[in-house]
């Protein structure tokens, strides 16, 4: 469908979300999807076979569980869920830690981005937007060595943040209850 301009677009068809550091608005018809992803998955399934595809997914899950466990063991973080059922997981700052921290997850996002990692920090949807989380999606090709490098970069960033004498700008915004966005990722 094509609309002459934005004013003709029914507001009910658009959905906005704070994603990867920017407000993203998406328009779509319910239950409509492009076929390219389905074709790509079909190709991979034919090329790799069930066992190959299964091995890739098992590796992704293993790495996700490992990262989930290690991040959850850090005193400043709290995992959103106890189990990892997909190769992704979400965590936030531990409530007690957050009360006295001089930094926010937006600062951690920026620090990780300087090390080459794209780990988004974002607020949750309406009615719980005061909660900020970070998310890791473990994709095909992420190795245990890469996971260890990411975990080391997270630990190093937290260690640097804990040396701060004064709060960061994002922490001051958090205290003032101002809406925040992480730095926008460019691909």
Regions found by a protein language model. Give the residues of each.
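Short, solvent-exposed loop/turn elements at beta->coil junctions and helix N-caps
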Residues: 77, 122-126
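PLP-dependent enzyme catalytic core of the Aspartate aminotransferase-like
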Residues: 128-187
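Conserved PLP-binding catalytic core of the aspartate aminotransferase-like
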Residues: 77-118, 138-140, 144, 182-183
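Active-site C-terminal subdomain of aminotransferase-like
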Residues: 1-86, 92-97
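Generic non-transmembrane alpha-helical segments
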Residues: 66, 70-74, 107-117, 153-164
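Short conserved micro-motifs at the rims of enzyme active sites and ligand-binding pockets
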Residues: 12-14, 100, 147-149
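Short glycine/proline-enriched loop/turn "hinge" motifs that connect secondary-structure elements
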Residues: 31-34, 125-130
């Amino acid at each position: 469908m094509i609309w002459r301009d934005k004013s003709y677009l029914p507001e009910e068809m658009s959905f906005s979300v704070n994603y990867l550091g920017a407000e993203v608005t998406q328009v779509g018809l319910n239950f409509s999807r492009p076929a390219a992803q389905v074709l790509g998955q079909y190709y991979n399934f034919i090329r790799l076979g069930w066992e190959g595809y299964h091995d890739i997914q098992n590796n992704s899950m293993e790495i996700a569980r490992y990262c989930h466990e290690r991040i959850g063991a850090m005193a400043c973080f709290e995992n959103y869920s106890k189990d990892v059922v997909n190769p992704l997981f979400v965590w936030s700052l531990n409530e007690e830690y957050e009360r006295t921290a001089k930094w926010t997850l937006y600062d951690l996002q920026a620090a990780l981005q300087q090390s080459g990692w794209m780990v988004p920090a974002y607020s949750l949807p309406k009615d719980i937007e005061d909660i900020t989380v970070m998310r890791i999606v473990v994709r095909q090709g992420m190795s245990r060595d890469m996971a260890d490098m990411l975990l080391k970069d997270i630990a190093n960033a937290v260690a640097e943040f804990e040396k701060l004498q004064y709060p960061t700008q994002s922490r001051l915004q958090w205290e003032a209850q101002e809406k925040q966005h992480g730095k926008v990722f460019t691909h």
